[in-house]
Amino acid sequence: MTRRAVSRKRRAAPGTGPGEQSDWDHSAHKRKRLPPEKKSLVFYLKSRELKPHNDSSYLRLLRGHAACTLPGILSEREFHLGTLNKVFASQWLNHRQVVCGTKCNTLFVVDVQTGQITKIPILKDREPLSGSHQSCGIHAIEINPSRTLLATGGDNPNSIAVYRLPTLDPVCVGDGGHNDWIFSIAWISDTMAVSGSRDGSMALWEMTEEILSKSDFQHGLSRVPVYAHISHKALKDIPKESSNPVNCKVRALAFNSKNKELGAVSLDGFFHLWKAELTLAKLLSTKLPYCRENVCLAYGLEWSLYAVGSQAHVSFLDPRQPPQCAKSVYCREQGSGIRSVSFYEHIVTVGTGQGALLFYDIRAQRFLEDSTGSCRNSKYKGDLLKLSTGKGWLNHNEMWMNYFSDIDCCPNAVYTHCYDSSGTKLFVAGGPLPTGLHGNYAGLWS
């Protein structure tokens, strides 16, 4: 068999003429080699993905799937808060710190990795409070859109206190606006916040550039906390729609950043909508479908819906639709009330007065079920998915001795809950529901 002759001549480079031999450029050949990371198996597998890892629709799909699946696999880790009384408000500061406010008027930060508690000094009014003053505690903590300022209650529960983030240095106190306790706060821009009070009014506060720069300058000169005092920019009373004006107390606020609209819930069972930009202008007031114990409100931007908690229902309101179109869902927690509510993706998380967390799927229009039967309160597969708070701490005071000593464990109302930025950690806090009982609960579900 004759062997075919094979030419060992190198192919001429493009552009070389006939009979010309191109030089072999070894340095150019080396420069064209793929970088090591592109030769890896990881790079090869990532190149085969159906969607790029930074594709927004793909990420939204993943977040939605996680939001629906995660509640069924969450496990609880309790924190010990000492003798603090009832955690009413909370917000994540970063991936490991949560700031909280209590009924005993304590502002503190808890490290969810170590459990360490750090108390933050609360800010005082221009004039000292009278000796007869009685505090209701800190009911609201809110962070502005750029996460540079935090607003909460002051030493006087009628006043709003603003801190700088991430240092929690004091910036200013807004005093002289309300005659009664502040129940809720909402930021309507990076420098403007609205407070809602038990006196039936809403106050608009502005942290001007002058206030912020002055605060920076004073902190640079003094080792003692120094802060400004500001007055409200606008003050509006909610409409007295009911026959009992005493119940016209602003209980909760939620802001729609897209339409610049502020929703407010009052204890007389009404929902109020305001245009909130440089001032507050009323748009509408409507009677709620369930008007007992309306103490919590949240806005879902993606769904253009307000969620309002009541004694046993969560009602979903779309201000663009007639009031009779509002949909309500029964939470099977008759008598204890809905104490906190929030949106994450298509899941509405509901905290109850009986220490339960429920999860409502807006798309499926039903509560999530326990698909495994492994949750603490589930007896059978397919039961309603319900997470129950731990024992917490309870002071066996005179109230407990007289009325509750025969009860082994008093459930802790979920007064506040919040997801971290990843949506994989849920901070839950509260305390005993009866007014005279003193106790606390805080836990991380992850």
Curated annotation (Swiss-Prot):
Function: Substrate-recognition component of a DCX (DDB1-CUL4-X-box) E3 ubiquitin-protein ligase complex of the DesCEND (destruction via C-end degrons) pathway, which recognizes a C-degron located at the extreme C terminus of target proteins, leading to their ubiquitination and degradation. The C-degron recognized by the DesCEND pathway is usually a motif of less than ten residues and can be present in full-length proteins, truncated proteins or proteolytically cleaved forms.
Tagged with keyword Amino-acid biosynthesis: no
Organism per entry: Xenopus tropicalis (Western clawed frog)
Pathways per UniProt: Protein modification; protein ubiquitination
Region (Disordered): 1-33
Localization: Cytoplasm; Cytoplasm, Cytoskeleton, Microtubule organizing center, Centrosome; Nucleus
Family under the similarity heading: Belongs to the WD repeat DCAF12 family.
WD repeat ranges, renumbered to this chain: 132-173, 177-215, 245-284, 333-370
UniProt-recorded name of the protein: DDB1- and CUL4-associated factor 12
Domain of life: Eukaryota
A GO CC annotation given for this chain: centrosome
InterPro entries assigned to the protein according to its UniProt record, in alphabetical order: Beta-prop_DCAF12, DCAF12, WD40/YVTN_repeat-like_dom_sf, WD40_repeat_CS, WD40_repeat_dom_sf, WD40_rpt
Main location: cytoplasm
